[in-house]
Each structure stands twice: as C-alpha cells, then as structure tokens.
Amino acid sequence: MATLTSSICSKPKASVFDPHKSSFHGVPIATQARLSPVKSTPVNLAVTAAAMPYDLRSFKFEPIKESIVSREMTRRYMMDMITYADTDVVVVGAGSAGLSCAYELSKNPSVQVAIIEQSVSPGGGAWLGGQLFSSMVVRKPAHRFLDELGLEYDEQDNYVVIKHAALFTSTIMSKLLARPNVKLFNAVAAEDLIIKEGKVGGVVTNWALVSMNHDTQSCMDPNVMEAKVVVSSCGHDGPFGATGVKRLRSVGMIDSVPGMKALDMNTAEDEIVRLTREVVPGMIVTGMEVAEIDGSPRMGPTFGAMMISGQKAAHLALKSLGLPNALDGTYIGNLHPELVLAAAADAAEIAEA
C-alpha cells in the first residue's frame, strides 16, 4: 500500500517529492516581524560582472531555426493530448480549489491528472484578496496546508494572512506543474460532459476562444478527454462558472441548481467542505460550485475552504479509483478529521444534501 503525505495527517510520512521536509514544518512569521522594513543587501556590480562566464555587452543566444521552435511546441502538446486523451482524473477549473485538488491527487505518482482551465492564466480569483486587495486570509486549521507548501504568513489567533494572494497561487502551481503525472491545459474550455449509462466519463473540450465565439463562427466541433473521475471546480455561476452542475441539471441528472445564498463566512466555509462530494457517479464537485448546487452561503474573501474542499475532493477521487485515501481508513497516518470533513455530518446526510 502506497504511503502518501498530506496536511490532513497529524503524523505525516515523508513526502514522495520532498523526503526531507514534513508537511507540518511551515514557516509562520510573527506579525511584528512583518512590520519591520527589510533592507536589501548592496550588490557590487563590478564583482558580479567579472564573475559572469560571458560578456553582457556582446551577448548572443545560440542560433535556432524558427521551424524547430514550432515543431518542439507542437510535438510536445500533441503528445500531451494523446497521453491525456484517456486519463485517471480530469480537474475542470484551476482556481484555488482545483489546484489544491490536483496537488493532493498528484502526490500519488501513479495517478494521472489533467487540469482544464479556460483562462490563459490559471488561479481563478486567488491572485488577489477581496476587492482587488493583495492579502489572502486563511482561517485555521487550513494553515496546515500552507505549512506543507512552505508559505510564509502572519499568524493571528484564529487565522493567518499571506502578504499577497499571488504567493499562494504561484507556489502551488510551481510545485504542482513540476510533477510528471500532471498536465495543465490552459486556454481550453470544458464545453460538455461525456455521460454513459448514468455515469460521467470525461469532458468535451475546445479552445476557449472557440467556445466564446460559437455564435459568430461556423460549426467548430470539439475534442474529448475520457477520465475515470471528473472533478468539477468551475466556481460560482458565470459564463464559464458552475458549468458542471448546470450541465447535470440540463440533462436531468440533478433536479436543480439553486445558486449560492448571501454571505456568511462562518457558515459558508464549513458547508463547502462538508458538502464536497460525488454528486453523480463519476463526478465530484468542489469549491464554490458546491455553494451553487446546494444553496450554501457565499464566503467572501477567505480561502481556507477552497484549499480543504480541494483536498477532500482529491481523496474522494482516490477512493473512487480504489487507492489509499483519507476517507475510508486506508490512508497511512493519523488523520485530522477537521481537515477532511470540517463541520461534517455523517455520510448519509451529505449524500442527501
């Protein structure tokens, strides 16, 4: 049985990607330290330039044929499309929930993960905090996930603050996309679902710009990507939001998508994690899309639920794949139940929600 490391374990084993670092050895910084100005160290440009192995005044790149650049990009992308045409898990939406899900899933090197993101820039709304401010507020105990990523933060009694939300998003993306079992297909939209015999079996894809212009162009047929599990993390309602659950409603697999209620942070974050689940066979819903399908309150500019909902979705996917996971006791390690289910009721209540 494989041993994996997760921030939802109280005594994590060594990570398969960083055997010298525990998930719990983060680097929280006291608030007062943050308020002290940081002075840069003067750099001696003369010494630096002298140590360089080349002369910047006559710098030249190695020559290359333009066709080689084209072939390298095309060949590698086509190989990725072939490789991930039939994959283990497709995560639709690369916001904070989708990225957290893919990060947790891909710790198991045997699980092949494709991420579909309609935007050129992944990250969803997690590049900034509320109202375009910089800081990201994360309520405890989700700070354990930040510890695992090695992120610095200012620690308060019940929450922590990252000085810029982009630090979280850029850090998790750099760690995630370096893994050999992960491929991000950005600027690609999931236009539809593959559904066979009452089970979701993949997604229908197209270039995002094509999807946005179907009414102005002639028919441009899509492509497909089969998957054993689809994780829908498309966010709240919008042109490309909540598309997974809206499609389930339109084909009659669920009854309604009532939409999220007015803001209530304390209720919202617990509910989003608790209600993260497999809504129909083959499809798990995570992040703010959960609020759309269940009529939960919106949570506003706090991000802990996105991270832990994504982690929970990952373990639901692992369970569906028959692999060790934190939900059925097969995962190695002592669990922090609050990080798996938050304010969780029993499985029957979640299934009926």
Swiss-Prot record:
It catalyses: [ADP-thiazole synthase]-L-cysteine + glycine + NAD(+) = [ADP-thiazole synthase]-dehydroalanine + ADP-5-ethyl-4-methylthiazole-2-carboxylate + nicotinamide + 3 H2O + 2 H(+). One of its GO terms (biological process) is thiazole biosynthetic process. Gene3D superfamilies: 6.10.250.2840, FAD/NAD(P)-binding domain. Residues 1-48 form a transit peptide. Its main location: plastid. It is found in: Plastid, Chloroplast. Binds 1 Fe cation per subunit. Substrate binds at A97, E117, Q118, G125, A190, D221, H236, M288, R298, M299, G300. It comes from the Eukaryota. InterPro entries: FAD/NAD-bd_sf, Sti35, Thi4_fam. During the catalytic reaction, a sulfide is transferred from Cys-219 to a reaction intermediate, generating a dehydroalanine residue. The keyword Iron applies. Its EC number is 2.4.2.60. Keywords: Chloroplast, Iron, Metal-binding, NAD, Plastid, Thiamine biosynthesis, Transferase, Transit peptide. GO terms for cellular component: chloroplast stroma; cytosol. The keyword Plastid applies. The modification 2,3-didehydroalanine (Cys) is found at C219. Its cofactor is Fe cation. GO terms for molecular function: cysteine-dependent adenosine diphosphate thiazole synthase activity; iron ion binding. Involved in biosynthesis of the thiamine precursor thiazole. Catalyzes the conversion of NAD and glycine to adenosine diphosphate 5-(2-hydroxyethyl)-4-methylthiazole-2-carboxylic acid (ADT), an adenylated thiazole intermediate. The reaction includes an iron-dependent sulfide transfer from a conserved cysteine residue of the protein to a thiazole intermediate. The enzyme can only undergo a single turnover, which suggests it is a suicide enzyme. May have additional roles in adaptation to various stress conditions and in DNA damage tolerance. NCBIfam families: sulfide-dependent adenosine diphosphate thiazole synthase. HAMAP family: THI4. Homooctamer. Belongs to the THI4 family. This is Thiamine thiazole synthase 1, chloroplastic. It comes from Vitis vinifera (Grape). The lineage of its organism: Eukaryota, Viridiplantae, Streptophyta, Embryophyta, Tracheophyta.
